[in-house]
Structures are given as structure tokens and as C-alpha cells.
Design a protein with these regions (language model features):
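N-terminal intrinsically disordered, cationic/polar leader segments
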Residues: 1-68, 72-137, 141, 146-170
Length: 170
């Protein structure tokens, strides 16, 4: 189902989706067919083999993510847990204080909005779900959560399996 606020243009193997939050473009393989009828987008196959069925599901989901992204945007929230862990946004970069001897500067790619709430919560918004996930993973890779003290950068709602420390010799 295509939202009314979204324009779709399918030419050859190229899909262009325009909406309130931006424009996304993706090239699809020739085995995938796309038809527009009555506000619906139908993704089909030219021949059905096991590998082609997998690609069919993949591209159906990718196109659906494009439709949702340009009409609503995707949001990932990261939480910084640890003493002295802070974040701030400067034009075109995210500055993190993560216990290193220097602040960590991460360049914000085009099409991604970053907002810091209360110094320890980072909201990342984008219409491209793939770019959003890659950027969030890049930020998280600077301090992944560790199981002993529970410090690090976590996705909102993520639970860290805690481990007991070493039991000393007695």
C-alpha cells in the first residue's frame, strides 16, 4: 500500500521514491518486476527459483522501507551509560566524551539528523533505514556495552547480560 503523500517513479531497473522527508533511489535486478495499481505497489518475479524468491522478499522489504522512510522517517535512540560519558552535536559532527583522553568526533552524513537529549541520549533520524543503521553502529562501535559493569553505548531498550567478576582465591 502506497501512502498518498509519496510519489513513486519506476523506470527500467530504477525505483525513485519521493516524500515529505526526502528522495530515495534504488536499483533493482531484472528478475524483479514492479507494477503500480490502485495505490498499491506489486513486486513480482520473472521466474521463480529458490534464490529468486529470497531476492523477491528482500527487495519487497527494501522498497517498503523506502516508502515508510520518506513518509515517516526512522528513529534509533542510543543511550550512553557510564560515568562521564556525554554527547553533544556541533554542525556536521557528533562529539562524544567516552572516557578516552580525547573527545571522539564523528562526521554526520547527509540525510541523517542527530539530536542529543540530556547529554546521555542520542536520537538519530533518517529516511534511509540502511544509512541510519550503519551510522548508529558506527557510533556504538566506539564503546560497545561491556558485560561486567554495563558501561558503553546501548540501543534504547537493549538489555546487557551481566557477568560476575573474578572470584578471588581463598
Amino acid at each position: 500500500k502506497v501512502p498518498t503523500t509519496v510519489d513513486i517513479n519506476v523506470t527500467n531497473n530504477n525505483v525513485v521514491v519521493k516524500g515529505k522527508f526526502g528522495t530515495l533511489e534504488r536499483t533493482i535486478p531484472e528478475i524483479i518486476t514492479i507494477e503500480q495499481t490502485d495505490g498499491n505497489l506489486i513486486v513480482g518475479l520473472t521466474n521463480e527459483t529458490r534464490g529468486n524468491k529470497a531476492l523477491h522478499g528482500l527487495y519487497r522489504t527494501l522498497i517498503n522501507n523506502m516508502l515508510v522512510g520518506v513518509s515517516e522517517q526512522f528513529i534509533i535512540t542510543l543511550v550512553l551509560q557510564g560515568v562521564g560519558y556525554r554527547a553533544s552535536v556541533q554542525p556536521k559532527s557528533l562529539v562524544l566524551s567516552l572516557g578516552y583522553s580525547h573527545p571522539v568526533n564523528i562526521d554526520i552524513p547527509d540525510g541523517i539528523e542527530v539530536e542529543v537529549v540530556q547529554n546521555t541520549t542520542i536520537n538519530i533520524k533518517a529516511c534511509d533505514k540502511e544509512q541510519l543503521g550503519l551510522f548508529a553502529a558506527k557510533v556504538r562501535s566506539w564503546r560497545p556495552p561491556e558485560p561486567y559493569k554495563g558501561k558503553g553505548i546501548l540501543y534504547k531498550g537493549e538489555k546487557i547480560l551481566r557477568k560476575a567478576g573474578k572470584s578471588g582465591k581463598k
